[in-house]
């Protein structure tokens, strides 16, 4: 992060369920940060494709702040981009956004770079895998981050 980013108030934003453990890790470091939460999920279609549905947003003002959008997996990138748009619509434009993921795919990285404001977005991935399955899961990846943290959904 740039030192100027640290001069701004920090907001840690995450996508509910899968992102909560990652969110807590960032909050342990940025302990004075504000929080933002978004409920987003994949709505599968019969043909195997999906759309991302955003249903719940909880955030204060993002205007002029540094937002850390933390999502453990950046598969297609569409969830991160849609969540960013929803947060900006509700909370205003942050001065800078850092998207942080543990694992991304080449497709997800490319999508975020094309669909989020280039001048005010930084993307951080610990690893970038080359491949997605036909269901848009990262290969080899780590599996479903939410299921790993909380157990399989019923």
Residue ranges and their predicted role:
Residues 7-15, 98-100:
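Short glycine-rich phosphate-binding loop at a beta-alpha junction
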Residues 19-23, 106-109:
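Short, well-ordered alpha-helical microsegments
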Residues 75-83:
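Short glycine/serine/threonine-rich phosphate/pyrophosphate-binding segments
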Residues 1-3:
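Short, small-residue-biased leader/transition segments that mark boundaries at the very start
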Residues 28, 82-154:
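PRPP-dependent phosphoribosyltransferase catalytic core
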Residues 20-67, 78:
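Short, glycine/charge-rich flexible loops or terminal/linker lids adjacent to PRPP-binding catalytic cores
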Residues 9, 32-34, 64, 94-96, ...:
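A generic structural signal for alpha->beta connector loops
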């Amino acid at each position: 992060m740039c030192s100027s980013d640290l001069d701004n108030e920090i907001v840690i934003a995450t996508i509910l369920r899968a992102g909560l453990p990652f969110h807590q890790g960032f909050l342990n470091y940025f302990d004075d940060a504000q929080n933002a939460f978004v409920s987003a999920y994949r709505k599968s279609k019969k043909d195997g494709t999906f759309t991302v549905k955003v249903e719940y947003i909880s955030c204060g003002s993002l205007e002029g702040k540094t937002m850390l959008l933390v999502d453990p997996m950046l598969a297609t990138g569409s969830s991160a981009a849609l969540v960013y748009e929803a947060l900006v619509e509700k909370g205003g434009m942050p001065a800078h956004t850092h998207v942080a993921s543990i694992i991304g795919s080449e497709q997800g990285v490319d999508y975020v770079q094309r669909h989020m404001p280039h001048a005010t977005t930084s993307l951080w991935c610990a690893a970038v895998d080359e491949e997605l399955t036909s269901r848009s899961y990262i290969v080899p990846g780590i599996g479903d981050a939410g299921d790993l943290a909380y157990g399989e959904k019923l």
